[in-house]
Curated annotation (Swiss-Prot):
Predicted to be exported by the Tat system. The position of the signal peptide cleavage has not been experimentally proven. It comes from the Bacteria. PROSITE patterns: TAT (PS51318). It comes from Shewanella baltica (strain OS195). This is Glycosyl hydrolase family 109 protein.
Length: 459
């Protein structure tokens, strides 16, 4: 969506920086939000919505990410694009033009102010809503969507505070509606192959994972009045921690069956100095430019360590500032071997192709031939044609619609979205307390102990 309250956001960022003086108050509030809460309704683990012959879709936010979803949905069978909402007319026009050119009916349009999405939610001919807006709108919009009787699919992260995570979870339980945070990386070809290999025991008992979002995005600071950088830049002045943990953490969590037999227990976090964005602003903008008036407090590199209840460890890193190649790490280590991404490589002690585990096997084709995931075997070629981060976006959306039309549970639920997203705020709490460990809330309220593990999902 459009640059919502950007000036006010800047003021809030300054207030948040000043508020670090009262970190103990924040930590006390965090402690109370970790404590178990009364269940708002029946657990939604394994929730199956009634089958839908046709899935009727509404979109809140059709800017950069939202328009990508519109493009992908136009390639899916069994869907109707009923309505779109945004505060920026240009992106609405682009979305309408694309939908009509794909020989689909023109959708209803909602715009005018920041709350126009509520008019879209008031419709009774929409089954699911896709939310692709600035981060601060994700939780409020997800909550209102479920309360309007619709299933919710929200971009990452799902929420920005522990309390918001609880509110989204409680709403899903109370309304018995799906709320899936759309972690697309879980549907990448490599990630799904590794999930298949893990479930078949190739790596033995899992011990350790490494996840990251390492993506140099300083150039987004030049997006001043519109696009992602017009609002995302300010988060680097508002928080110090892992701002965006889910892309790397989602797949590793599913490898380890987090919330399905294991769960995150506690986290410790630390950040490097925050230098890169101020240096970039000084180099790329005039001295009196607003980008040079900001105080960037988010460390250029954040590293967090997570311990699970079963004793496994996960390293999670965030870096969108330093000049380096893209990586999500995507490492999973077990008692029999390891997979690591960027570049993809494997080493196993038993069950490999004759290569010593002291050396990396970089030839992925033979591993694909043996372990390529059923989803990619079925729709991989179509996904590669339609694109979307190498096809993972298409596979994710295809799978979502398949589950809704065939009466199956989604692969990611509201507890996953909350557990992966809350790393954002927990990393900040740990940093504010000299990197001491902080406890994860159990958003499942104990149900993780009996939840069915995520299998090798198919179609």
């Amino acid at each position: 969506m459009h640059n919502i309250h950007r000036r006010n956001f800047l003021k809030a960022a300054g207030a948040a920086t000043a508020g670090l003086v009262t970190a103990n108050i924040a930590l006390n509030a965090y402690a109370s939000s970790v404590a178990p809460k009364p269940q708002a309704g029946k657990s939604v683990i394994g929730l199956i919505a009634p089958k839908m012959d046709v899935v009727r879709v509404g979109f809140i936010g059709v800017g950069e990410r939202g328009f990508s979803h519109v493009e992908q949905f136009c390639h899916l069978e069994g869907v109707e694009l009923k309505a779109i909402c945004d505060t920026h007319q240009a992106v609405l026009d682009r979305a309408i033009d694309h939908i009509v050119k794909q020989n689909r009916p023109k959708p209803a349009v909602y715009t005018g102010n920041d709350l126009s999405y509520r008019d879209l939610l008031s419709r009774d001919d929409i089954d699911i809503v896709i939310i692709s807006t600035p981060w601060e709108w994700h939780a409020p919009m997800a909550i209102e969507t479920m309360e309007s009787g619709k299933h919710t699919f929200v971009e990452v992260p799902m929420a920005l505070t522990v309390e918001e995570c609880w509110q989204v979870v409680d709403t899903a339980e109370r309304t018995q509606k799906n709320c899936m945070m759309m972690e697309n990386v879980n549907y990448g070809r490599e990630e799904l192959m590794v999930l298949n290999m893990v479930r078949q025991g190739v790596f033995g008992e899992l011990l350790h994972g490494e996840a990251a979002y390492i993506h140099e995005l300083r150039w987004q600071m030049k997006e001043i009045d519109h696009k992602t950088g017009s609002w995302r830049t300010y988060w680097h002045t508002k928080r110090n921690g892992n701002l965006y943990p889910t892309h790397g953490l989602g797949p590793v969590s599913q490898y380890m069956n987090i919330n399905r037999g294991d769960r995150f227990d506690y986290l410790t976090s630390m950040s490097s100095p925050a230098l890169g964005r101020a240096l970039y602003a000084k180099r790329e903008f005039p001295a009196d430019h607003e980008r040079n008036q900001l105080k960037y407090i988010n460390g250029d590199i954040n590293t967090s360590l997570i311990k699970t209840v079963k004793g496994r460890t996960i390293m999670v890193q965030h870096d969108t500032t330093t000049p380096r190649p893209y990586s999500r790490h995507n490492l999973i280590q077990g008692t029999n071997g390891v997979f690591a991404g960027f570049p993809n490589r494997i080493a196993v002690e038993n069950g490999g192709f004759g290569q010593s585990y002291h050396e990396w096997d970089m030839d992925m084709q033979k591993w694909y031939d043996k372990y390529d995931h059923p989803l990619w075997q079925r729709i991989g070629k179509e996904a590669e044609i339609n694109g979307g981060h190498g096809g993972m976006d298409f596979v994710m959306l295809w799978r979502m619609i398949y589950c809704l039309r065939n009466g199956e549970a989604l692969d990611q639920d509201v507890y996953d979205g909350a557990s992966w997203s809350v790393v954002n705020i927990l990393s900040e709490h740990s940093l504010n307390d000299r990197s001491n460990s902080v406890t994860f809330p159990d958003f499942t309220r104990g149900a993780w102990q009996t939840a069915k593990p995520l299998g090798i999902v198919g179609a």
